[in-house]
């Protein structure tokens, strides 16, 4: 095991604070509408230009081990805030830096770090309650667009795209972001449930122009096993033919004689059918078949439920208004399932999301909720160059997370104003002793820091603006984009409550840990091994002359 360097007290803390400051100073220049860009070097390809706080934070690794510890702790603030709320990473970093900076002064003057932390925690809890009180719900398209625009660094076109997508697929719908092929942003919406399996034979196509099979008002047969024997299918096919409606078969696979017979019937116009494989694999396949059954008001023909293909009746088949089957995708539009059953299924899947441990599982479950609840929208980001595309895509993703957070917990005035207003809840607080009161004071000072930084990045005098905003009431604040004092909500400068709350809580949590640190253990830098000796010189007089 390598030897370690153990550093105590002020020496450890001051080194870690240096690391905090290096990281925070690099991140905070991106804050606000007039924030600057940061250029990140890449080991291959061109550099990346970004205004995203967490992207900058993730790139920073410092040579000095103790400085790096401090930087990594603040990096944790940014990434945790990004994971929970999807935005607010720069605000969280600015808050953490301020709490650490002010707190260190008090620790150096001999105050008890534990009491300081208790005071900080008390103040943050009161501020969070106040933020929840002043929060207002975010329901209209206009408000959603405003949140998206602010989060995408005041790019209103991105906000409008996200609001349009949410309007089309609902608040629960899945919205994904992809690279576009043109200069303009595009929005593709898939209504109904879509899964990534296409027709098993091109002979099922009945719309040659679009190369798809379209079934109007069809029955849907769901089976969890392979179908290879046509005899198993005959009874149900006869019932469907009598009803004079088309049929979609979703099974593990349809092959051999069964597939050939379906194709022949289709070509001759006796019975319009399409066969597709069931989506997903293993347990996920069973769950998705069950989802389709609930959406279409049918049942999965499976041994577990005591149903067999030979005895299947029309009552066990699902129904839909329209189904489109392409080469790679199947879309079920307007399934005949009961709203109450679908709602119950959505609740059940949501409960599984809460318990999911891996990001992959959570993502797949969220997709299932969206497919049951309404649809999928894809925002295709357009840009002139690849570098711009990457930067813009990151902003769209940020904005998307922020709008979700806004719909979830509501919105507050943006531009650092909400934190200034939440200070009123802390102003009257007192701790159990003078050290706790100092902790409360630290948070009071830190909560004006985001506004200070926004103003500084805009090239104005921070103290004057902070005093003017603090003297105002409600949503009165400073719009750094225009340099005017306005009602922030009316001007469309709003932040999701969840983002502001999460930033403050995470910043206080990590800053409190730093303040209460009294020793740091780091690996000693490896000493370079001395150069190996050269070859000895030859001895004189050893020539080989004969």
UniProtKB/Swiss-Prot annotation:
Keywords: ATP-binding, Chaperone, Cytoplasm, Isomerase, Nucleotide-binding. The keyword Cell division does not apply. ATP binds at residues 30-33, 51, 87-91, 415, 479-481, 495. Residues 526-546 are annotated as: Disordered. InterPro entries: Chaperonin_Cpn60_CS (IPR018370), Cpn60/GroEL (IPR001844), Cpn60/GroEL/TCP-1 (IPR002423), GroEL-like_apical_dom_sf (IPR027409), GROEL-like_equatorial_sf (IPR027413), TCP-1-like_intermed_sf (IPR027410). GO terms for cellular component: cytoplasm. Its EC number is 5.6.1.7. It catalyses: ATP + H2O + a folded polypeptide = ADP + phosphate + an unfolded polypeptide. It is an enzyme of class 5 (isomerase). It holds the Pfam family Cpn60_TCP1. Its main location: cytoplasm. Residues 534-546 have a biased composition (Gly residues). Together with its co-chaperonin GroES, plays an essential role in assisting protein folding. The GroEL-GroES system forms a nano-cage that allows encapsulation of the non-native substrate proteins and provides a physical environment optimized to promote and accelerate protein folding. NCBIfam families: GroEL, PRK00013.1, PRK12849.1, PRK12850.1, PRK12851.1. HAMAP family: CH60. Forms a cylinder of 14 subunits composed of two heptameric rings stacked back-to-back. Interacts with the co-chaperonin GroES. This is Chaperonin GroEL. It comes from Burkholderia cepacia. The lineage of its organism: Bacteria, Pseudomonadati, Pseudomonadota, Betaproteobacteria, Burkholderiales. The gene is groEL.
């Amino acid at each position: 095991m390598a030897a370690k360097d153990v550093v105590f007290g002020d020496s450890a803390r001051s080194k870690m604070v240096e690391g905090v400051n290096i990281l925070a100073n690099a991140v905070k220049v991106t804050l606000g509408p007039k924030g600057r860009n940061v250029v990140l070097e890449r080991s291959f390809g061109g550099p990346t230009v970004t205004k995203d706080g967490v992207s900058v934070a993730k790139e920073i690794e410092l040579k000095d081990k103790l400085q790096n510890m401090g930087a990594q702790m603040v990096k944790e603030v940014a990434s945790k805030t990004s994971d929970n709320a999807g935005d607010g990473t720069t605000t969280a970093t600015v808050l953490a830096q301020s709490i650490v900076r002010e707190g260190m002064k008090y620790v150096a003057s001999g105050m008890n770090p534990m009491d300081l932390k208790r005071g900080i925690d008390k103040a943050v809890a009161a501020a969070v309650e106040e933020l929840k009180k002043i929060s207002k719900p975010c329901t209209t398209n206009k408000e959603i667009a405003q949140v998206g625009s602010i989060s995408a660094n005041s790019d209103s076109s991105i906000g409008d795209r996200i609001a349009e997508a949410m309007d089309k697929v609902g608040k629960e719908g899945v919205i994904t972001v992809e690279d576009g092929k043109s200069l303009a942003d595009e929005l593709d919406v898939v209504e109904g449930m879509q899964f990534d399996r296409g027709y098993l034979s091109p002979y099922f196509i009945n719309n040659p122009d679009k190369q798809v099979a379209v079934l109007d008002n069809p029955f849907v047969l769901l089976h969890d096993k392979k179908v290879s024997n046509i005899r198993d299918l005959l009874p149900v096919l006869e019932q469907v033919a009598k009803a004079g409606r088309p049929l979609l078969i979703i099974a593990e696979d349809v092959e051999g004689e069964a597939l050939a017979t379906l194709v022949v019937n289709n070509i001759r116009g006796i019975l319009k059918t399409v066969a597709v494989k069931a989506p997903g694999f293993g347990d996920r396949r069973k769950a998705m078949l069950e989802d389709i059954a609930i959406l279409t008001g049918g049942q999965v023909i499976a041994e577990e439920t005591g149903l067999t293909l030979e005895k299947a009746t029309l009552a066990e088949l699902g129904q839909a208004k329209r189904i489109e089957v392409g080469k790679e995708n199947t879309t079920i539009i307007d399934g005949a399932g009961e709203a109450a059953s679908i709602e119950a299924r959505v609740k059940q899947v949501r409960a599984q999301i809460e318990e999911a441990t891996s990001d992959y599982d959570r993502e797949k479950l969220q997709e299932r909720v969206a497919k049951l609840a309404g649809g999928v929208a894809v925002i295709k980001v357009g840009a002139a160059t690849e570098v711009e595309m990457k930067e813009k895509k990151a902003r769209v993703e940020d904005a998307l997370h922020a709008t979700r957070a806004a719909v979830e917990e509501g919105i507050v005035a943006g531009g650092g104003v909400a934190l200034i207003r939440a200070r009123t809840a802390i102003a009257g607080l007192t701790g159990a002793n003078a050290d706790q009161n100092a902790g409360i004071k630290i948070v009071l000072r830190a909560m004006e820091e985001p506004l200070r930084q926004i103003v500084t990045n805009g090239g104005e005098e921070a103290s004057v603006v902070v005093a003017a905003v603090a003297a105002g009431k409600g949503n009165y604040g400073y719009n750094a984009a225009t340099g005017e004092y306005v009602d922030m909500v009316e001007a469309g400068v709003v932040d999701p409550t969840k983002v502001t709350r999460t930033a403050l809580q995470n910043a206080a949590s990590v800053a409190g840990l730093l303040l209460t640190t009294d020793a740091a253990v780091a690996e000693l830098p490896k000493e370079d091994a001395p150069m190996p000796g050269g070859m000895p010189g030859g001895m004189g007089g050893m020539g080989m002359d004969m």
